[in-house]
Each structure stands twice: as structure tokens, then as C-alpha cells.
């Protein structure tokens, strides 16, 4: 069997025939008084099919990698699973995964699979391919606690390598607009030449034919910040004929949030592509009132025919690096050039002044946080700096006896990285308002980690361990922002439809058997900012492509994950 899953807009003819034959076979056997055999039968569960409709009590049968019967199943399963008192739903889809490196270290995908995530979708601005020689060398140099050989050149090569190593979840990726830009322009703050842009478009087309899901951008950071709207339109003009989606970390989530949303809509309108906003938020208390206008703006665009969606992580803090506290101009040329400039006294004075001064020319998450006491340092490469892990920027500045701005610059230089950083910038009421919109799905914006080994060297955002369980526990059960059936839809059929995944995201005959069995009364996130390495609770069993990966709350060791190819893939 191929490790690649065909993801056409509708089930393939062969898939429909298999289901048709299974139904005929079931009817024949029942008429004859016999019982068909299945690989797995899940019995007496409360079935949430992903559609948002009210649940029904029933059974579900699996043969091979697919669901073949839903309702009352008379036949026996080689494995019989009693789901009495439990919810049974499609596997959850992580629309914004940074499991790129963590899956190379540990293919079990523990922090996500223990929440019921069965598909990791990567590619926010940066993707693991295609790689120029320069970018490949940079990736090697920037590796931190997780070390790995780079044996691939293309995005497809990377995804293939994951499956060859073994992964418990399915995997997919957008091609990163930042990756494409670095391959052809480097870190220069300029527009591409006509020849460079043509080469960039060709690279996008190749990635789409290899199975990319579209183009992902991350416009707050250098060098993506240097790309103007026409460049992004050109990349999407290359991806759109393949059914590609444009998905973006907006150019601004603060002072110019509304203008940034307009830019995304312009790209969608000019290319005819659907578009999604990564981790929609209004960053910084001064900008929180803008969210109501943004939501209304998106509703209006959708009513006018644009297919605009968004995803969120359900926490009041974001996580990125100290680069988000410094102006983009100082970062031109990449990390080495950035660190060198930060050692020039005149440059340091200018950067420090700009770090302290509000502006709408670039996005400062340090200023959006309101105070360095609301900025937490979460990950270092250098062992000498690891004792600062989990401390606030204000506390570290006090320990070092330097200003907040000087401390941030010194840490970037000494660590050899942008330094993992958590910023408290998001309004709780806005999270609830966003979740009430039927076009909002969920993404962790984090790696898929484990509470052991190399992962314990960092103090990650708890969203890595809790985003999906938090939606079902806090926002569904406790706060009643969503019904359970709607909460399930947001994490299953909605992202599947946005990604054009015809056979995932639903409990229906012919769908791949990505299935979660969980207790609605007990599911919850346990990870905190103080103690992030804690798995969610309440998920009992998880199946991926018909194989049981979690049994009674314990990982089975199985790694049946596949590459989920985009709609333009040529096999």
C-alpha cells in the first residue's frame, strides 16, 4: 500500500466502489444470517460525525485504513472497542503545526496525539523544503537541542523522510513564502527581479506538484517582512491553478491589523484563491477593540463571495522570538548579519531607541505586551543561558544589571539564535468572540513535543500540549462558548473542507479511519506556563489510518502516519 493518501475534492471512484461493495456485501451477509468480519468495531459510542449535527448513539466499523460502516454494526471486529459513555469523533486537524523538527526527534507526536490530533499541517512562512545550498547550510547552523541530518532537498523529500522514519500522525505542509524568498533573494530588503520572481513561481509550481497544500507566509518577520503584496500575489498565482490555499501570519496583528487583513483579502481576490489567517488575534491591549471590526470585515467579505477563514490557539499569550522585539532593518541579511550589527555601539543605541518607541512601521511584541514582566524567555541554544529559561525578560535584565533592550540584544548575540520568547498580548474576551465565528478552526502554533528527553531542555508555550483539549474542556464544557458538536466540527470537517481533504474530517463510510474516543466530562488541558510539559487528559483512544495509536490513554508505539498530499499533487 502506498504511504500517500489521495486527497481529491471528492472520494475517488475506487473508494466509492469499495464502500458500495462493502454495503452490498453487508446486506448479503445479513440476509444470509452471517456476520461480516471487520478489523475494528467501535461499539455503543456517542458519534460526533464532524458535521456539527447533533450526535447519535451507534457503532463504527473499520476495515483496513477506512471507515466502512456507521450506525448499527452486526458483524464482529477482530478488535472490539467499547465506547459506552464516550464521544467518538474524527481525528483533529492541527492547522498550524511547528512539528517540523520535533517529529524528526520523536515521531510519536506525543503532545498532539494525546489530545486527539491526527494530522499536522506545517509551513507557516518557512517550510522544510525546497532548500538551496545556502538555506540548507543555515538550517544546519541554526539547529538547537534537536540535531538531525538534512538528507532532502525538496518539500516532498522532507515529508517522505518523516514517513520513512515513522510518524504517528499524518503530515502535510504548505510551501513557505519565506523559504522561497531566501532561496532566490536571500535576506535582502528588496523586491525580486523579474527573473527571480519567475524562478520563485516555478519553485512554487514544483512544490504544488509534489503535494504542497498552498503558500504559507509569515509577514511580521524578516525577511518575509520585505515582501510586498505584488510578490505574494505572484506566488499565489502560481499555486492557485493547483487548488492551493493562501495562509498567512498577517503583516500586523496590532496597530495595522485591519490593513493587514485587507492585504490578505486583496491576495485572495486577485488570485481567486481561498485564504486563511493564521492565529487570528489583536495583539496588545490598545488594539483589542479592533477585533470586533475585523470579524465584521471578514463576515462581509465572505458574504461577498471570498472564501476567508481563520484559525486560533486558545491562549492569551503568543510565542515566537526576540526578533519580534527588534526592528526588521537590523535583521537584514540573516542571523549572522543581525548579530554582528548588534555589536556596533551606534547600531545598539538606535535599536534600543526603536525598541522603546511605539510605531506602526513594524510590529513590536515587546511593546504590545505592555511590560517586560509579561515577556517570558522559553528556549535557548546555549547551555550557559538555559538557567534563564522560564524567567521574564524583566527578571533577566535585573539579574544581568542591564536595560531590557540591552539584555535582549545581548541574549540574541550570546545564544546564537533569536531566543524562544512568550509574549502575553491577547484578550480572553476576543478569544471567545473569535471562537463563536463558524469559520474559525484551531492550530497549536507549536511543535509536537514529549514530556521527556531533549524536549525538557526548553519551557514551551502550553499550547503545544493543550490547544485542542482546551477548546473542548474550557470553551465547550466549562464556558459553553460552543456546543460539543460544533467544537468537534471546528477541529475536523471545517479544516478538512478548507484544505480540500475529501476523505478526512468526518465519520462516514469511505473516510480514512482517523478517530478519537474521548470523555467530554473530563477532557482538559493540564499544561501551564509554569509547568508546560503535561499531557492533556480525557482522550482514551486514537486511531490513525485504522491503526490504534493510543489505547486507554497510553501510546501504543504505532506510527501509521502518511503524507497527505495537496490537490495539485502529481504522483
Where are these regions (language model features)?
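Bacterial N-terminal signal peptides that target proteins for export
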Residues: 3-23
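C-terminal motif of bacterial Sec signal peptides marking the signal peptidase cleavage site
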Residues: 30-31
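Histidine-rich, glycine-flanked metal-binding segment
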Residues: 34-38, 47-91, 106, 525
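C-terminal cap of metal-dependent C-N hydrolases
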Residues: 45, 344, 433-439, 445, ...
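Acidic, glycine-enriched loop/beta-strand segments at the rims
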Residues: 47-59, 418-426, 430-431, 479-489, ...
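Divalent-metal coordination cores built from histidine and acidic residues
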Residues: 86-88, 92-93, 97, 103-214, ...
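Active-site neighborhoods of metal-dependent hydrolases
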Residues: 159-162, 167-194, 198-221, 232, ...
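Alpha-helix-loop-beta-strand connector modules within alpha/beta enzyme cores
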Residues: 233-244, 248
Amino acid at each position: 500500500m502506498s504511504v500517500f493518501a489521495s486527497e481529491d475534492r471528492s472520494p475517488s471512484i475506487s473508494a466509492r466502489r469499495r464502500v458500495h461493495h462493502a454495503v452490498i456485501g453487508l446486506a448479503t451477509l445479513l440476509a444470509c444470517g452471517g456476520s461480516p468480519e471487520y478489523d475494528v468495531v467501535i461499539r455503543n459510542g456517542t458519534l460526533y460525525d464532524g458535521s456539527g449535527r447533533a450526535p447519535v448513539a451507534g457503532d463504527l466499523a473499520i476495515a483496513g485504513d477506512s471507515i466502512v460502516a456507521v450506525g448499527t454494526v452486526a458483524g464482529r471486529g477482530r478488535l472490539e472497542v467499547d465506547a459506552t459513555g464516550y464521544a467518538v469523533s474524527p481525528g483533529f486537524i492541527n492547522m498550524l503545526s511547528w512539528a517540523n523538527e520535533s517529529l524528526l526527534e520523536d515521531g510519536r507526536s506525543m503532545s498532539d496525539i494525546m489530545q486527539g490530533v491526527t494530522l499536522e499541517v506545517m509551513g507557516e512562512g518557512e517550510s522544510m523544503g525546497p532548500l538551496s545550498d545556502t538555506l540548507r547550510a543555515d538550517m544546519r547552523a541554526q539547529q538547537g537541542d534537536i540535531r538531525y541530518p538534512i538528507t532532502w532537498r525538496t518539500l516532498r523529500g522532507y515529508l517522505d523522510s518523516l514517513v520513512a522514519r515513522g510518524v504517528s500522525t499524518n503530515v502535510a505542509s504548505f510551501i513557505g513564502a519565506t523559504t522561497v524568498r531566501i532561496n532566490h533573494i536571500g535576506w535582502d530588503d528588496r523586491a525580486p527581479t523579474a527573473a527571480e520572481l519567475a524562478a520563485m513561481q516555478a519553485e512554487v509550481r514544483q512544490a504544488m506538484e509534489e503535494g504542497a497544500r498552498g503558500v504559507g507566509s509569515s509577514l511580521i518577520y524578516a525577511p518575509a517582512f520585505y515582501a510586498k503584496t505584488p510578490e505574494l500575489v505572484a506566488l499565489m498565482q502560481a499555486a492557485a491553478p493547483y487548488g492551493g490555499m493562501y495562509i498567512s501570519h498577517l503583516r500586523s496583528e496590532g496597530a495595522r491589523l485591519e490593513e493587514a487583513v485587507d492585504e490578505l483579502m486583496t491576495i485572495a481576490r486577485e488570485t481567486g484563491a481561498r485564504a486563511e489567517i493564521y492565529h487570528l488575534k489583536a495583539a496588545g491591549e490598545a488594539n483589542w477593540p479592533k477585533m470586533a471590526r475585523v470579524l465584521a470585515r471578514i463576515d462581509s467579505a465572505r458574504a461577498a463571495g471570498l472564501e476567508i477563514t481563520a484559525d486560533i490557539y486558545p491562549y492569551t499569550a503568543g510565542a515566537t522570538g526576540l526578533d519580534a522585539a527588534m526592528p526588521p532593518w537590523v535583521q537584514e541579511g540573516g542571523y549572522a548579519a543581525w548579530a554582528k550589527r548588534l555589536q556596533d555601539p551606534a547600531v545598539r543605541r538606535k535599536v534600543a531607541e526603536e525598541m522603546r518607541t511605539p510605531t506602526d512601521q513594524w510590529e513590536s511584541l515587546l511593546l504590545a505586551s505592555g511590560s517586560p514582566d509579561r515577556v517570558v524567555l522559553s528556549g535557548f541554544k546555549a547551555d550557559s543561558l538555559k538557567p534563564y529559561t522560564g524567567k521574564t525578560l524583566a527578571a533577566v535584565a535585573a539579574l544581568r544589571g542591564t536595560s531590557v533592550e540591552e539584555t535582549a540584544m545581548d541574549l540574541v548575540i550570546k545564544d546564537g539564535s533569536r531566543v524562544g520568547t512568550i509574549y502575553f498580548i491577547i484578550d480572553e474576551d476576543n478569544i471567545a468572540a473569535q471562537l463563536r465565528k463558524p469559520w474559525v478552526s484551531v492550530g497549536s502554533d507549536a511543535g509536537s513535543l514529549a514530556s521527556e528527553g531533549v524536549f525538557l531542555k526548553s519551557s514551551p508555550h502550553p499550547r503545544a500540549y493543550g490547544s485542542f483539549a482546551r477548546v473542548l474542556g474550557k470553551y465547550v464544557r466549562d464556558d459553553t462558548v460552543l456546543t460539543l458538536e460544533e467544537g468537534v466540527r471546528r477541529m475536523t470537517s471545517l479544516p478538512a473542507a478548507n484544505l480540500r481533504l475529501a476523505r478526512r474530517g468526518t465519520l462516514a463510510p469511505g473516510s480514512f479511519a482517523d478517530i478519537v474516543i474521548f470523555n467530554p466530562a473530563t477532557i482538559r488541558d493540564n499544561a501551564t506556563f509554569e509547568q508546560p510539559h503535561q499531557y492533556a487528559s480525557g482522550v482514551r483512544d486514537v486511531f490513525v489510518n485504522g491503526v490504534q495509536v493510543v489505547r486507554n490513554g497510553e501510546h501504543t508505539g504505532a506510527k501509521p502516519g502518511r503524507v497527505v498530499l495537496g490537490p495539485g499533487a502529481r504522483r
